[in-house]
């Protein structure tokens, strides 16, 4: 009788050990599944962040030149910034912002699609065009190889394209002006100049 009891007890212990082992295997499997899923999510997020970072670093704008129109000998009334994109991608100008500060106030300008035009005659003065007013800038297309910048609703420039961002802003002589052309993605184009003490000519190069 005692021998049978001991055998039954050993059998019960063996079954208990087997149950614990199976439970441990199941827990390990669940944990492994969670780790694999987490690793996959992290890899996906890392890839997305890497692509976004590459886009931010490689793309962007360059301000090639800034010109101004003098309404008299001591004040500018119009500014034109010639911009081109960096190598790494295209820039939608309709989502870009221009900021300018003269030291006393900072102004922000957004795109006005009604002030978009192709410049097909180099002999015409750019300042004879109807420019955007208020807190808006317009676009004059100088060079556009694929036609992407010639769409008024969302002019998009890519490598090799050149446009002039046009805006009206009164700037006095001997004034330090700084600003940026900020695209939705990528590095901003930098505007930085000081106006001269007297404007001898109507059209002046500022930067």
From Swiss-Prot:
Propeptide feature ranges: 1-11
GO molecular function per UniProt: structural molecule activity
Keyword presence, Translocase: no
Domain of life: Archaea
Cellular component per GO, a single term: archaeal-type flagellum
UniProt keyword Transcription, yes or no: no
Main subcellular localisation: other
GO BP annotation list: archaeal or bacterial-type flagellum-dependent cell motility
InterPro entries: Flagellin/pilin_N_arc, Flagellin_arc
Subcellular location: Archaeal flagellum
Keyword terms, alphabetized: Archaeal flagellum
Family annotation (NCBIfam families): arch_flag_Nterm, PRK08541.1
PANTHER family (alphabetical): FLAGELLIN B1 (PTHR35903:SF1)
Protein role: Flagellin is the subunit protein which polymerizes to form the filaments of archaeal flagella.
Protein name: Flagellin B3
Organism: Methanococcus vannielii (strain ATCC 35089 / DSM 1224 / JCM 13029 / OCM 148 / SB)
Lineage, highest ranks first: Archaea, Methanobacteriati, Methanobacteriota, Methanomada group, Methanococci
């Amino acid at each position: 009788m005692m021998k049978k009891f001991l055998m039954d007890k050993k059998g019960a212990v063996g079954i208990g050990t087997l149950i614990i082992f199976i439970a441990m295997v199941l827990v390990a499997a669940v944990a492994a599944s969670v780790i694999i899923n987490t690793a996959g999510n992290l890899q996906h997020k890392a890839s997305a962040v890497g692509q976004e970072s590459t886009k931010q670093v490689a793309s962007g704008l360059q301000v090639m030149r800034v010109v101004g129109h003098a309404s008299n000998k001591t004040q500018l009334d119009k500014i034109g910034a010639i911009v081109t994109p960096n190598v790494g991608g295209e820039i939608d100008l309709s989502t870009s912002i221009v900021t300018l500060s003269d030291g006393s106030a900072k102004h922000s300008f957004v795109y006005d699609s009604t002030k978009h035009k192709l410049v097909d005659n180099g002999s015409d003065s750019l300042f004879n065009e109807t420019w955007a007013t208020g807190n808006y800038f317009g676009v004059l297309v100088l060079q556009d190889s694929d036609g992407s910048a010639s769409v008024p609703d969302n002019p998009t420039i890519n490598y090799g394209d050149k446009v002039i961002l046009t805006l009206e802003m009164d700037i006095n002589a001997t004034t330090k002006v700084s600003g940026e052309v900020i695209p939705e993605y990528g590095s901003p184009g930098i505007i930085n100049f000081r106006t001269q003490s007297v404007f001898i000519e109507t059209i002046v190069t500022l930067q």
